[in-house]
Each structure stands twice: as C-alpha cells, then as structure tokens.
C-alpha cells in the first residue's frame, strides 16, 4: 500500500481475511452451526428464485401462505424494490433495513457450503448499498427509513457475524471484501456521528460500534470505534439504569435486550 501497489495490498488483505482468527464474537460459534428449520426457510425465501421474500420479524404475507415473508421483487421482475411497503407500518420499513434474514442465510451457507447463499448475500447486499446511499452528514436521520442509527447498528452487528460465516467462501472476491469493509467503516462512523441522546437505542448503537472496533482491529478507525463505544456503554450504566439496575425505559423486553448488549 505504501508504495502505491493497491491491488497487491488488497490481495494481502484477502489473505489476511481468509486466515485471521476473529475476536470472541458472542453471536457466533462456528464449532456448532446448525440452522433451525425456520432459518433454513428464511435462507431459501430470500433467493431470487423465490422472489426475494425477505424475512422480517412478525411480518408475513398471508395471501402467500402461512408464515411466508413478503416479496420485495420489483414490478419489472428484474431486481429488488426496497421501497415496497406492504403494511404501511413504520416498524416494517425499519425492519426491512435491518436485514434480519442475512444471518440465518449465512448460517445455512456455513452448514451446507452451498455457494448460492453467499452469491445471494452478495447480490442482495450489493443492491441494497446501491439503492440506499448514506445521507449527507448533518441530515436528520432520527426517523430515516434505511439509515436510522438503531437499524444501522443492527446491520453492523450482523455484518461482523456475516464476515465470519463467509470467511472461506469462494464467492467472496477481493472486490467484494473491500466493498463490505468499506461500508462496515461507513456504518460505524455514521453511528458515532448520530448516537441517540438516550434510551436503549443508544446502548445498542454503542454495542455495534464496540463490536466493530474489537472484532476488526486491523481497520483504520477501529481504535476510535472501541474508545467511543465502550465510553458510551460505560456512561449508560448510570445514565440509562436506575440504582436498582432496572432500565429507565421501563419495558421488560428492552431491559433484557439492553443487558444483552453489555455482553
């Protein structure tokens, strides 16, 4: 890189990626990857041949059958339409941009070694990147459909896992690895510049930034991510919780997920 041979630098990055030992990611255990029956279904539903039916938590197309995800296939039939919004519920749109089907699909790839799942990830995430560019810095992203900080955090946490499941995939090229890492950097920096002022959202955002910093220490901004994320988490121990340990949001579900974020 220092002598200007950027392609060779990228080749070395790929070699490093293939052989690296990842940090301890509490969300990934490669020694025992067994997708559930539902995860296998979600992996297959997301394929082009099944009309890009992307799993979203609690959102199903009743007209297509029992527990069948909605299709995000474009009307022209030749791609994905990320603006499809079947229910009109804001939460559904947010969940679409969390990419909740990608980890189940990655687990299915890892257990089967079927490259069609890796190729689908590359196709779908690559398309998402093109169709959902990051807003300019200074834009109010509090309720942004695809770049709301909470949803960015969910994507970032999952990207850290995806890069482990697909580590040895022959479909992951130098160019694709570079693209994923570039946008991992973009995601972490976006969160740091747009932390929520308070609430469980802020805790999840800090967890995501910390994950990126600790699991990808080779990246240029990793030290800043780790410092930022752990700093916010440390502050949240007192700012987001009552002295008895109860989350100030007051919701049991958020309390449990907030505690999980400190793992």
Model-predicted segments: where are they?
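Extreme N-terminal leader/anchor segments
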Residues: 1-63, 71
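Short linear motifs in intrinsically disordered/low-complexity regions
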Residues: 3-6, 26, 30, 82, ...
């Amino acid at each position: 890189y220092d002598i200007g041979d950027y392609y060779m630098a990228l080749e070395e990055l790929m070699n490093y990626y293939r052989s690296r030992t990842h940090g301890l990611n509490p969300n990934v255990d490669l020694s025992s990857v067994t997708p559930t029956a539902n995860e296998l279904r979600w992996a297959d539903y997301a394929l082009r041949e099944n009309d890009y039916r992307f799993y979203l938590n609690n959102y199903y197309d009743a007209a297509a059958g029992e527990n069948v995800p909605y299709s995000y296939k474009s009307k022209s039939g030749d791609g994905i339409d990320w603006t499809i919004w079947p229910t009109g519920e804001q939460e559904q749109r947010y969940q679409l941009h969390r990419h909740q089907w990608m980890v189940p699909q990655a687990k299915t790839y890892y257990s089967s070694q079927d490259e069609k799942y890796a190729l689908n990830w590359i196709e779908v995430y690559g398309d998402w990147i093109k169709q959902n560019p990051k807003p300019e810095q200074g834009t109010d992203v509090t309720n942004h459909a695809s770049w709301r900080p909470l949803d960015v955090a969910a994507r970032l946490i999952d990207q850290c896992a995806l890069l482990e499941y697909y580590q040895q995939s022959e479909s992951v090229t130098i160019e694709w690895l570079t693209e994923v890492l570039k946008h991992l950097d973009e995601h972490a920096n976006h969160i740091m510049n747009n932390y929520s002022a308070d609430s469980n959202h802020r805790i999840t955002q800090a967890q995501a930034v910390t994950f990126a910093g600790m699991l990808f220490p080779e990246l240029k901004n990793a030290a800043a991510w780790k410092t930022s994320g752990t700093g916010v988490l440390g502050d949240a121990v007192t700012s987001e919780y009552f002295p008895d340990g109860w989350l100030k949001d007051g919701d049991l579900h958020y309390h449990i997920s907030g505690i999980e974020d400190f793992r």
